[in-house]
């Protein structure tokens, strides 16, 4: 951030995460209390505070709290819920669900890129020194729903449920601010993404999905 302090950069987009909300029963907007339940989320909050604290008349940061990403990308991720379930449908011919009632806001990776472009092209007075949840209200899903969508999209993959290892993260997020300011509406859907991932796996393009390159925890001890 040294170059920022010298005034070389006017606008920075910071990729944060909706997991800063941790747990919450209500629809959570950008003003909702933060309740991180992982080191990953705590470090994101600390980084948000640092970069937003640098905002002034000459430097305008924008914090983007991203939903959980999904979909095919050149550097594929198989440690994200939709991608994991799609991959397991191919390798195990079943989907494993732990708990299932937890809410999670989802966002296609191409839609995420679209939001970055929109923020860079927007009037700085509109997006500077602002925090945005990035996603769409209609892609807030419970994990059970995600499994059902993917299982049906891939031809009736069976679902196995396990209540012994529950994920503490459970949050449903409002994206009204983003839609109102930038007119963002997602184009990607979970079922289309699952089919595209399966096609890539079947073609052999991705090789062995167990390769370390597909999992961030091999490179960073912070929880994803």
Region spans (language model):
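Active-site Tyr-X1-5-Lys
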Residues: 23, 35-65, 90-91
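Conserved Rossmann-fold NAD(P)-dependent oxidoreductase catalytic core, especially the SDR/UDP-sugar
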Residues: 1-39
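Short-chain dehydrogenase/reductase
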Residues: 32, 37-45, 75-80, 105-106, ...
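Conserved sequence/active-site signature of Rossmann-fold short-chain dehydrogenase/reductase
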Residues: 20, 69-71, 112, 139
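C-terminal substrate-binding subdomain of Rossmann-fold SDR/epimerase-dehydratase oxidoreductases
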Residues: 93, 97-101, 105-224
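Conserved SDR Rossmann-fold cofactor-binding beta-strand/turn motif
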Residues: 16, 65-66, 70
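Hydrophobic alpha-helix immediately C-terminal to the catalytic Tyr-X-X-X-Lys motif of short-chain
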Residues: 46, 50, 54, 85, ...
């Amino acid at each position: 951030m040294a170059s920022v302090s010298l005034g070389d950069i006017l606008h920075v987009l910071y990729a944060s995460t909706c997991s800063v909300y941790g747990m919450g029963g209500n629809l959570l907007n950008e003003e909702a209390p933060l309740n991180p339940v992982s080191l990953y989320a705590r470090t994101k909050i600390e980084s948000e505070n640092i970069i937003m604290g640098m905002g002034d008349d000459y430097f305008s940061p924008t914090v983007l709290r991203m939903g959980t990403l999904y979909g095919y990308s050149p550097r594929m991720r198989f440690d994200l819920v939709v991608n994991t379930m799609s991959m397991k449908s191919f390798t195990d011919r079943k989907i494993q669900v732990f708990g299932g009632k937890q809410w999670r806001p989802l966002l296609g990776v191409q839609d995420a890129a679209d939001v970055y472009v929109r923020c860079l092209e927007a009037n700085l007075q509109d997006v500077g020194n602002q925090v945005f949840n990035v996603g769409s209200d209609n892609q807030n899903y419970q994990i059970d729903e995600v499994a059902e969508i993917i299982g049906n999209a891939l031809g009736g993959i069976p679902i196995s449920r396990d209540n012994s290892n529950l994920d503490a993260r459970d949050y449903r997020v409002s994206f009204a601010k983003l839609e109102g300011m930038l007119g963002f509406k997602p184009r990607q859907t979970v079922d289309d993404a699952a089919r595209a991932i399966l096609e890539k796996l079947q073609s052999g393009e991705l090789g062995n999905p167990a390769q370390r390159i597909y999992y961030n925890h091999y490179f960073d001890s912070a929880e994803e």
